[in-house]
């Protein structure tokens, strides 16, 4: 490796290296590699007994190689003449290509005259390899000349940054900044071009990050230097200027390293084979390792390896469980899942020992493998929920510590500023810690990179914000100090938003909503207790947390809906968020203010506790409704077992009384009572549910054909199916519906969806010219109306527990059976309606011509089939599947092609 120091430019280049680092060199080299390879492979079966003679094909190919070489020579001459850098090396490389081209021309001609000669073939292969090496070296040299040009511009910017930092007065500072700005812009354009051409994704990311830091921090360095010149006595300004200058130096080094495709100091900061989180990668890897061929199983080899891997995973899980933000119940669940995973591994190893030496895995072994993967999946889910506990708590009212710090600085209270600076620093560290926790359990490789980059920038910004506050505290009347503080405040808030969005991208909205719902429930109960205990501060603080959580839920859900095509689903979700933000939260805020005012007055004024409790309950209900609306399009397979927790949460205060008689029976929900049915009655219900599942599978098969974007009939069918599944789950003592009122509410939702489907169906029928199709569709729509009505009646399931002669008897089975039957009938009607709607739409299209292919809101497009590998992979590999953002085109690797020619030397 040689380093060229021209004008203090550290240019690293190994003249012997043939490593191709950019896509441009690959693209230019590819045609020549293809032509040479084709020529070399001509008649490659070796000597034959056929009549010797001239090969026209070989001559044609040799001529094309010669022409391609001439083209390279023309371009090489032009580059060598125009290049300001590495001129001598480029001229020498062009001459080498010319020399090797002549040798190749001679060897190819001889081979074309006698293509059956192995000696002449060997000579041509060696000449081809030498030619490709020479051309590759020429292209790499030309590429490095471009890099050298970029490094020269980088040096100009680096010197300009130093001059800006060391400016002796404000006039000089202004001149230096004015001169630096266009140079930075010029460098940014050159670096962006280089970034696009880099082959290595890591180098591209490094270049992008460094460019961003440079663009953002040059104006901030100007402001910081200006503040230093105006207030030389304030140490905080000097500290800030030095911090920003250090960041800019790192950015310059980052651009230099990325441009030359060399490793930077921080390249190995985040190991992990998958590029995702360490814990997620370890779990994915463990899931792969547990699949072993019984023939090759050896306890001495596999047991220590698997146990060691698992203990490493459990150590990571334990760290998360012991973190301060992890709830006690979540900690207990993580510990329980860790123990369950340990036990499942021991059971699996025992089964492997029993199957050792066999060709096929036994059913018991397959069952143990399934159990093992289920347990690791359960552990994953609890870890995700633990991370969401942290995210929900930490990314809440993120600007409060900053505002408190700035307020203290404006008052000129340096002692308070130092105290609040510590709080602010802890808050920043918590955000960074939680962001890294979220990364550890995520498989989203690109998302994890973005989170870590954002967290790193936030970490660098934290001391700068504190220094700006200390400077403002020293000169609270200074306009420059206030502007400087505003600048850093804006930068901090922007960076926190970027980090928040990045964390949201790598976490599941389903997990976020489940955890937020539980946290709001906790806070609502705390609010009610604070009200009863007349704790004004506690009430105000907890109510603020509720408002913050609700606002965050609304923001996250609204952002998520931007990813969907507008339709029935998005309307329902946005309707629920609008209800919470426009109606529920204002009422809750009003009640909180009234309560705080009543409790703060002397003497304390009486207030309506029930009104406050109702307003609090509505907040929880609003969050739950949003969550249910978001989950509406999820299939049962996509829903976690814990998406609807089995506990019966009571939002009301401990002293409040339930008024709905049918809601709680002897302290139990109706759903819990249904779960206590005798086995005989459960078997009857199971039989009905199995019949219902058959109809559901028919509906799944029908709707899975169609793309639901722009087709509200398919969206409504999925919604109705989901609600009916919840209702049938209720009859088995499972699912999200707990009480009769929940089932009635679900039936009303189905009726609403049915009426919307009826309206859409009738629109299609009105435009259908075929009377038979029209009559069929209208008949099925009438069935939907009928079965919706039946379902509404059957939804009033009265589950009761009676004590007859000392024996507990659970009633309500007949109602449950009727409910399932009505749901089954409705499901069948929906299937037939979807089919009839499609048929009627096609008749309409044929009669109206291509101009009106689709009716408004009903677009019948076949769903694109899922991409599947040609070779079936193991299920465990599916966790590692990545979605590529662009199609991958296979490029010929010239260096690989060269190495392959070496094998031909022996021919």
Curated annotation (Swiss-Prot):
Residue numbers bearing the Phosphoserine modification: 264, 268, 296, 298, 642, 653, 656, 852
Modified residues (N-acetylthreonine): 2
Topology with respect to the bilayer: Peripheral membrane protein
Residues recorded with modification Phosphothreonine: 635, 646, 659
SUPFAM superfamilies per the UniProt record, alphabetical: alpha-catenin/vinculin-like
Chain residue ranges for the region called Disordered: 865-895
Amino acid composition bias (Basic and acidic residues), ranges on this chain: 865-881
CC per GO annotation: actin cytoskeleton; adherens junction; catenin complex; cytoplasm; nucleus
Subcellular location: Cytoplasm, Cytoskeleton; Cell junction, Adherens junction; Cell membrane; Cell junction
Region (Interaction with alpha-actinin): 326-395
Keyword Transcription in record: no
GO molecular function: actin filament binding; beta-catenin binding; cadherin binding; structural molecule activity
Keywords for the protein's UniProt record, in alphabetical order: Acetylation, Cell adhesion, Cell junction, Cell membrane, Cytoplasm, Cytoskeleton, Isopeptide bond, Membrane, Nucleus, Phosphoprotein, Ubl conjugation
InterPro entries in UniProt: Alpha-catenin/vinculin-like_sf, Alpha_catenin, Vinculin/catenin, Vinculin_CS
Pfam families named in the record: Vinculin
Family named by the database record: Belongs to the vinculin/alpha-catenin family.
PANTHER family cross-referenced by the UniProt entry: ALPHA CATENIN, CATENIN ALPHA-1
Role according to the record: Associates with the cytoplasmic domain of a variety of cadherins. The association of catenins to cadherins produces a complex which is linked to the actin filament network, and which seems to be of primary importance for cadherins cell-adhesion properties. Can associate with both E- and N-cadherins. Originally believed to be a stable component of E-cadherin/catenin adhesion complexes and to mediate the linkage of cadherins to the actin cytoskeleton at adherens junctions.
Subunit structure: Monomer and homodimer; the monomer preferentially binds to CTNNB1 and the homodimer to actin. Component of an cadherin:catenin adhesion complex composed of at least of CDH26, beta-catenin/CTNNB1, alpha-catenin/CTNNA1 and p120 catenin/CTNND1. Possible component of an E-cadherin/ catenin adhesion complex together with E-cadherin/CDH1 and beta-catenin/CTNNB1 or gamma-catenin/JUP; the complex is located to adherens junctions. The stable association of CTNNA1 is controversial as CTNNA1 was shown not to bind to F-actin when assembled in the complex.
Protein name: Catenin alpha-1
